[in-house]
Amino acid sequence: MGSVNSRGHKAEAQVVMMGLDSAGKTTILYKLKGNQLVDTLPTVGFNVEPLEAPGHVSLTLWDIGGQTQLRATWKDYLEGIDLLVYVLDSTDEARLPEAVAELKEVLEDPNMAGVPFLVLANKQEAPGALPLLEIRNRLGLEGFQKHCWELRACSALTGQGLQEALQSLLHLLKSR
């Protein structure tokens, strides 16, 4: 779909955000879009927003609903994407195995061959949030050697870590 170049030309990229329901995908989308906190409802289907990123990169961000009944459709959004952003709730330790299983299933899809991904460990501002190192170990990210990836801590609520996440996203796009 899109391409990112280093010659100063405007580049475009398709970025899909996935994760379990209530992970914070929609809040992150709109916080990045306008630095605003919005009231959200569970996403049925998807939200899509353009975002002009630093370095003359035009992103199309797809926020895909994460409820159990919607996950069967996730594969429909993977064809031709440039990057996957996988959002997880750092406070929901009980659902971490489910989040890991869903991420693995997405990454095994043939459309994901060579596609980089960024994992956002959201809700880091909350008491009881799992530390980044523990999340990294539990996700088994080192096992995904066919993909370039990064893991970032963030808080959609406060905005902490989102600009760094955007920089990681751009770095991963350029690694393709």
UniProtKB/Swiss-Prot annotation:
One of its GO terms (biological process) is hematopoietic progenitor cell differentiation. A lipid is attached at G2 (N-myristoyl glycine). It comes from the Eukaryota. GO terms for molecular function: GTP binding; GTPase activity. The keyword tRNA-binding does not apply. GTP binds at residues 19-26, 63-67, 122-125. InterPro entries: P-loop_NTPase (IPR027417), Small_GTP-bd (IPR005225), Small_GTPase_ARF (IPR024156), Small_GTPase_ARF/SAR (IPR006689). Keywords: GTP-binding, Lipoprotein, Myristate, Nucleotide-binding. May play a role in apoptosis. May act as a tumor suppressor. Belongs to the small GTPase superfamily. Arf family. This is ADP-ribosylation factor-like protein 11. It comes from Mus musculus (Mouse). The lineage of its organism: Eukaryota, Metazoa, Chordata, Craniata, Vertebrata. The gene is Arl11.
